[in-house]
């Protein structure tokens, strides 16, 4: 549950080659598709769903979500294109997070805690979300500890749109 999309993609790619070779060997041994006992089912086009158009705003974090939803959103879009939010009028990409069981009374999207040499936390609709890695525009990914030192964060700063 802690893997992000890139890590999962790498793991699947590592094993896909072996499985593909097994599958191709199986097909090579078959005389006809009927030998495979595959059942073909036509798609019911009335039940088909289409995705929405992906835009830049698709990757913006909605802090009005639960801690788990935001954590999973960051995991899904980590690295490329990366989930992002606006902090002090600057776009910050959030690369890695961790769920917590801390609840804050501060407004949603507000920095609730700063743990030097570790992380900072942001209020969500239920629990605080620990931010572990971020990326500033044009800069490499950095730990939250490095970001805290350079950005001069303080409790009460707020992520916005």
Predicted regions and their residues:
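Active-site-proximal loop/hinge segments within enzyme catalytic domains
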Residues: 1-100
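An anion-binding loop in the catalytic cleft
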Residues: 58-161
């Amino acid at each position: 549950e802690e893997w992000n999309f890139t890590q999962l993609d790498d793991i699947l790619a590592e094993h896909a080659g072996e499985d593909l070779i097994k599958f191709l060997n199986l097909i090579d041994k078959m005389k006809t598709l009927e030998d495979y006992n595959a059942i073909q089912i036509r798609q019911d086009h009335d039940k088909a769903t289409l995705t929405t158009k992906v835009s830049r705003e698709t990757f913006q974090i909605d802090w009005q979500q639960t801690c788990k939803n935001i954590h999973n959103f960051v995991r899904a879009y980590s690295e490329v294109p990366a989930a992002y939010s606006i902090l002090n009028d600057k776009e910050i990409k959030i690369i890695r997070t961790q769920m917590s069981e801390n609840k804050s009374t501060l407004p949603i999207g507000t920095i609730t805690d700063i743990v030097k040499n570790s992380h900072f936390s942001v209020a969500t609709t239920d629990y605080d979300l620990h931010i572990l890695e971020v990326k500033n525009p044009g800069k490499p990914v950095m730990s939250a500890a490095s970001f805290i030192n350079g950005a001069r964060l303080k409790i009460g700063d707020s992520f916005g749109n």
